[in-house]
Design a protein with these regions (language model features):
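Alpha/beta catalytic barrel-like cores
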Residues: 1-108, 117-131, 135-146, 176, ...
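Eukaryote-skewed repeat-based solenoidal scaffolds used as protein-protein interaction platforms
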Residues: 134-206, 215
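Short active-site loop/helix that positions an aromatic residue
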Residues: 218-222
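Conserved, mostly hydrophobic/aromatic
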Residues: 112, 213, 294
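Glycine-rich, often proline-containing surface loops adjacent to acidic residues and nearby aromatics
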Residues: 108-117, 149-155
């Protein structure tokens, strides 16, 4: 099994390269010249996209082919003060350059919309904002020229006093999404509400790939399903038919990995990854899985990736393939 590692949004090694620079709504509102204020937002967005390109070049130098883009590339995107603003007109060239670089270097990019993007909500206003947010994320992927292998990952959401009703709301609304959005979605188990098995059921009903978060599973699972590997054959099936950018090669399933910050704070993410639980999981799924992509959700970002690779070199049964991939 070939394993590729990736990280989320920020690099600890590339200085002055934040892809999430912003302007507060209060600061925007204080600017008397609205046109000038909008131009400032657009300049910040272009800088964020340019910094993302810098990060991709850093990734290429270190053989990192898996990367999650910041959801904050466009500041104040979706804010009620800017309902008449279409930033994509100005950002087309910058996004095209970013996506072109990713395609040229066979990089797998994704988004993970923020926690307020929930389709299971009982509130109409939250739902409307969630739908707009998903549309915006997909529009960015489209502007990059990326096909449907570039995904947006979300959770099923809260249970709002009735988990079954919340799940049903999610399913109905998910099925009603425009095809261009629905085909780019993946669903992930969360750390408090919807377990891996419950999320998998929703994925099977909606025909959507599942991203298994093994840390979330550790802190949120049914007693009889403590070992998430029993779900893996079904999770693999949710990825059937998914192909890599511009090819007919099967898109590898993706998992998330993080380590608990402490015993008392088991849900929060630590700075680095404890390789033990990850390698135990990977060894157990290897016979069924030709390739898997692992997104590292650690506070130290790419430093955590490099540290994990360093520890992997000490494992006798693992073959290092690159600075960010290995075989077992």
């Amino acid at each position: 099994m070939i394993v590729r590692l990736g990280y989320v949004a920020m690099s600890m090694q590339v200085s002055n390269a934040s892809p999430s620079k912003t302007m507060t709504a209060a600061s925007f509102d204080k600017l008397n010249n609205r046109a000038a204020a909008v131009r400032k937002l657009e300049r910040i967005a272009i800088e964020n996209i340019h910094n993302t390109l810098r990060l991709l070049k850093h990734n290429r130098a270190h053989d990192i082919e898996l990367y999650r883009c910041s959801s904050k590339l466009i500041p104040l995107r979706g804010h009620e003060m800017l309902n008449d603003w279409n930033p994509m007109e100005v950002l087309t060239e910058a996004f095209a350059e970013l996506g072109g670089y990713a395609i040229k270097n066979a990089m797998r990019l994704s988004f993970h919309p923020d926690h307020f993007t929930v389709l299971s909500t009982p509130r109409a206003d939250v739902l409307a904002n969630s739908l707009a947010d998903l549309d915006s994320h997909v529009a960015m992927l489209e502007a990059m020229g990326l096909d449907e292998s570039a995904k947006c990952n979300i959770h099923v959401g809260g249970m709002y006093g009735d988990k079954q009703a919340a799940s049903q709301r999610f399913i109905e609304r998910f099925k009603a999404l425009p095809e261009r959005i629905r085909n780019r979605m993946t669903l992930e188990n969360d750390d408090k509400t919807f377990t891996a098995s419950e999320t998998l059921e929703v994925c099977e009903i909606t025909n959507t790939p599942m991203v298994l978060d093994i840390h979330h599973h550790e802190v949120n699972h049914e007693e009889e399903l403590a070992d998430c590997t029993v779900l893996w054959p079904r999770i693999l099936q949710t990825w059937k038919g998914q192909t890599e950018q511009g090819t007919q090669l099967e898109l590898p399933p993706k998992i998330h990995v993080s380590s608990p910050k402490s015993e008392k704070d088991a849900r929060s993410h630590a700075d680095f990854i404890d390789p033990g639980p990850l390698l135990t999981f990977l060894r157990s799924i290897a016979p069924l899985t030709p390739r898997v992509d692992v997104m590292i959700e650690a506070k130290k970002k790419d430093d955590a990736l490099f540290q994990l690779m360093k520890e992997i070199t000490e494992e006798s049964d693992l073959e290092v393939l690159s600075q960010a991939s290995f075989k077992l």
